[in-house]
Amino acid sequence: YNNSGDVELITARKNHRILVIDQTAGDNAIVYGQCETYSFRDMLLTALDQPNSDVILKIHPETAAGAKDGNLTSIQDLLDRPNLKVIGQQCNIVSLIKQVDEVYVMTSGVGLEALMVGKPVSCFGVPFYSGWGLTNDRVPVKNPRRQLSVESLFAATFLKYNLFYHPETQQPCSMDDCIEWIVKNKPFFEPIKLEW
C-alpha cells in the first residue's frame, strides 16, 4: 500500500469525519477476529448514524481492483446516503487517516496505523492491537490485557516481533535501514484530489 499518491480531500463540509475501512471477504483477520457480533453493515451504519458526521468508506485495494470480494454487496442500499463518500481508488492510507477525526475497523491493520497517527480507533472485531486500552473495543477481548502506550505497542509490533531484510542485499537489517531505503527509492506519485 506504499505505491500510490497522497490523498487530498477537497470539501467545504465541516462535519466530524469517520473513516470506515472495508476488508476483503474471507480475510483470515475477519474469520479469526471475533467478528460474529457485528457485521460490516453494522459498523457502517454505526458510523452513518453519528450526528453531524461525514463517513468516508475506503474500499480495500484488492476489492477495487476486482481481485477479491469485499462487503459492498451488503450495503448497496446505503450508498446513496448524503453523508457517505466511497473511495475505491488506491491511495496512501496514512494521508487519508490524517484528514479524518476517527477510524472504524473490523480487524484491519489500518487501525494500528491510525493509532500511530494519534487518531481514535473503534474496533468491531478483535485485532491484535485491541484490548490494550488504546482502542474503543466494541467486542470485549476474552483475555483481559494490561494497559499499553502506543509507543509500547509499536515497539512490540515493529521492533521485537518483526525481522527486517534489506530490499537490495536481502540481508537482515535494522528497521531504520529498511525505512531509509524505502524513502530513498519510493517513486513520486501525484497527489490524488477527491472532491466532496
What is the predicted function of each stretch?
Residues D27-I30, T63-A67, L112-E113, S130-G133:
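Short catalytic/ligand-binding loop motif for oxyanion handling, primarily in non-cytosolic enzymes
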Residues Q89-T135:
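A donor-sugar binding/catalytic signature common to diverse glycosyltransferases
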